[in-house]
Curated annotation (Swiss-Prot):
It catalyses: RNA(n) + a ribonucleoside 5'-triphosphate = RNA(n+1) + diphosphate. The RNAP catalytic core consists of 2 alpha, 1 beta, 1 beta' and 1 omega subunit. When a sigma factor is associated with the core the holoenzyme is formed, which can initiate transcription. This is DNA-directed RNA polymerase subunit omega. The gene is rpoZ. GO terms for molecular function: DNA binding; DNA-directed RNA polymerase activity.
């Protein structure tokens, strides 16, 4: 049954590796409770997924997009471009922006102002790593 189904799917998704990815993703969705769009006929989830792709009840493009979204760990959000009027205002007041940056500098560089004694005390406080047989 599955061999005939795969041959029917090759017409819809030309790359067989992509077909495997799409069908396995759809089979996982079915096992998680997604509604199926064809009769089950006592078939397992991968065969049902292949039959759905072969019968074109699901779009391969939609499945591919859903697969990509399920694999993404960080989703980029399109931020609106800055308004040209606000850019003109920031260019008109560069002295104010420089003054604000100078005020922030001492707070950001406090970690660079350690004395030599503090650095030596920190180095002496480090614990050497334990030797292991890995190397």
């Amino acid at each position: 049954m599955a061999r005939v189904t795969v041959e029917d799917c090759i017409d819809k998704v030309e790359n067989r590796f992509e077909l495997v990815l799409l069908a396995s993703h759809r089979a996982r969705l079915v096992s998680q409770g997604a509604p199926i769009t064809v009769d089950r006929d006592n078939d397992k989830n991968p065969v049902v997924a292949l039959r759905e792709i072969a019968d074109e009840t699901l779009s391969p493009g939609d499945l591919k997009e859903d697969l990509i979204h399920s694999l993404q760990k960080h989703v980029e959000v399109d931020e609106p471009e800055p308004d040209p009027a606000s850019l003109v205002q920031t260019e008109a007041t560069p002295a104010f922006a420089e003054a604000a940056e100078e005020e922030d500098q001492p707070e950001a560089l406090t970690f660079d102002r350690m004395s030599e004694e503090e650095l030596l005390a920190g180095i002496e406080g480090l614990v050497p790593p334990e030797k292991s047989d890995d190397y």
